[in-house]
Amino acid sequence: SIDRKTIKNNDMQSFHYILRSLLHSKGSNLLKVVSLGLGLTMSILLFSRVAFEQSYDTCFKDYDRLYQVWTQFTINGEKLDWQQQNSGPVAGAIFESFPEQVESATCTNRWMASDPLYYGNTRFDEPKIAADSLFFQTMGIEVLTGNPVQDLQQPNVIYLCETLARRMFGGEDPIGKVISYNYQRDLTVRGTYADLPDNTTVKADAVISLPPSWAVEVSNYSWDGGDSYPQYI
């Protein structure tokens, strides 16, 4: 039989041989190690990016039941391309016409909320959206404070995401604070909501009320054109 001393000597010889081989071709081995490390790093980054893209809009509650409304216009018998901008009343009409199939619907607008916000002399350029009173209910966004179904029916009301509210007011209670929309009109903070991630098509750090009565005054909120409203059901 082979004693332990012999086995130990054989192990040491093997280790010594491996070490000599590595030192003999250390340049080649270093290149292999670096290449392997870079390959693993790129693979991790690639898979992370794929996971990020594949999880778009999964931040919304019941995202698999949330749909964006698209419109296709026909002019003089010719069908135009599908577009994600709709006439103002479309989402509401779908909601009213299919009460058993549609639980909620909302109308939004970007350009009505495209100008900066100001609190005092400080400017805030975070992305914003104008939306009606069913926005949070339809999208399934967590509301932290406030009653958006009631509040967003009124003009000149704004809801802030948690991070933006903290940036603006620090540790102060944001409710009731008045901020300026590009020094054109004052907006009163009535509520806050949970931050939305970057991988969403509806990125908004602030939501400005979009009651139909106000939309009619500033834009074409009718069935006759005015197709500038992304909508969801």
Predicted features and spans:
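A short amphipathic helical element positioned immediately N-terminal to and/or at the very start
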Residues: 14-25
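Membrane-proximal extracellular/periplasmic loop immediately following the first transmembrane helix
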Residues: 46-114, 225-233
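Short beta-strand segments
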Residues: 35, 68-70, 106-107, 159, ...
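Short, strongly hydrophobic transmembrane alpha-helices
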Residues: 24-54, 64
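Short, Lys/Arg-enriched N-terminal segments with co-localized hydrophobic residues
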Residues: 1-11
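Mid-to-C-terminal secondary-structure elements
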Residues: 132-145, 158-233
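Short acidic/polar micro-motifs at solvent-exposed secondary-structure junctions
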Residues: 72-82, 106-134, 144-157, 182-184, ...
